[in-house]
UniProtKB/Swiss-Prot annotation:
It is found in: Peroxisome membrane. Keywords: Membrane, Metal-binding, Peroxisome, Peroxisome biogenesis, Protein transport, Transmembrane, Transmembrane helix, Transport, Ubl conjugation pathway, Zinc, Zinc-finger. Component of a retrotranslocation channel required for peroxisome organization by mediating export of the PEX5 receptor from peroxisomes to the cytosol, thereby promoting PEX5 recycling. The retrotranslocation channel is composed of PEX2, PEX10 and PEX12; each subunit contributing transmembrane segments that coassemble into an open channel that specifically allows the passage of PEX5 through the peroxisomal membrane. PEX12 also regulates PEX5 recycling by activating the E3 ubiquitin-protein ligase activity of PEX10. This is Peroxisome biogenesis protein 12. It comes from the Eukaryota. The gene is PEX12. One of its GO terms (biological process) is embryonic morphogenesis.
Amino acid sequence: MLFQVGGEGTRPTFFEMAAAQQLPASLRAALTYSLGVFALRRSFLHKILDYEDEFFAALMLILEGHSLRTTDGSFAESLYGLRRKSARLRLRKDSARKDSSEEVQHSGLEKRQRILSVVFLVVLPYFKSKLHAIYNKEREARLRESLWGAEDQGFDEADFFTGDDSIVSREPSGNEELSVRVQLATKIKKFIAVCYPWIHASSEGLSFTYQLLYLLDATGFYSLGLQALGIQVCRATGQELMDTSSRISKIRNHERERLRGPPWLKTVQGALLSCSYAVLDYAQTGLIAAVFIFKMMEWWYQSAEERLSAPTVYPPPPPPPAPKMAKEGIPLPPDRSLCALCLQKRANPSVVTVSGFVFCYSCVFKYVSKYKRCPVTLIPASVDQIRRLFQDT
């Protein structure tokens, strides 16, 4: 069995399908992060972040609906040059061999398939994100209660399925009796918290199975939703792209012809339609380009801030000038390896730290102990300012 990774024919590769599937999630993460940064200076954006799921669902509803209506492909699929086609199996008979085989026939999408595609692309992910949020809240509540030793068991399975009606309120006024509505909401949240892990595991397992079968070229459907709708994703040919452009032009001309009212109202409506068409035409590339530019600017300013916040490293200062030799001091020998006191090669070299001159340890120790000064510069010194030097062999 061969892996389906090549780019031949109208069948998209596994990597094209995976990239198209992951694009909406990546786009949502980038938009959420961008809005979070802008909300630091524009407080009204916090209202959008409070309804993040609804905002993104409405945005994707517009983009997906427009893309399916004009290009027969989802928002992400149209970026990769992919199209959705209705797939029907037809039994093909071979009279010579007297056997039969199945042949897939592709045709344009029906209205029902477009509507259900929007449901699978927008509505179901929206409900899944809401269920995931409820599950996380209930899980955090249970962990918090277990940490503080609360009596409420959160979404414990045994507590739910045994039908125990004793519900402890998480509010400070826990002794008050909860209303029927609150009790029902609590039961629903418990039910979601118990069932969501199984729903999520089943969904991910089916998704992985279909993706593996698609990679192995064992099926033409990339997901269960596509098979349920009878839709296969194919590469768009050059002729299909031209037909799509002409179809979009016909749809827009028909919408302009349907305008009614006085001339000034038609002009306003036509201008609004032109603006909406321009926004929808450039929404795909413009949205992704805006996020890309924002991330580039963020990286640029972050690098500049790191450079400004980094400690300034100055070059090391030049060494101080050597102390001058006193006229009454002991002169230095021409050979620098000789001791100025005994005029012999230095044994156990030691330095006087106040001046930096090196002598034999025994010679300089006796001299400094007696005269309390450096032999060459006559700078006051003590035996505590004598340091022995050791050389690596």
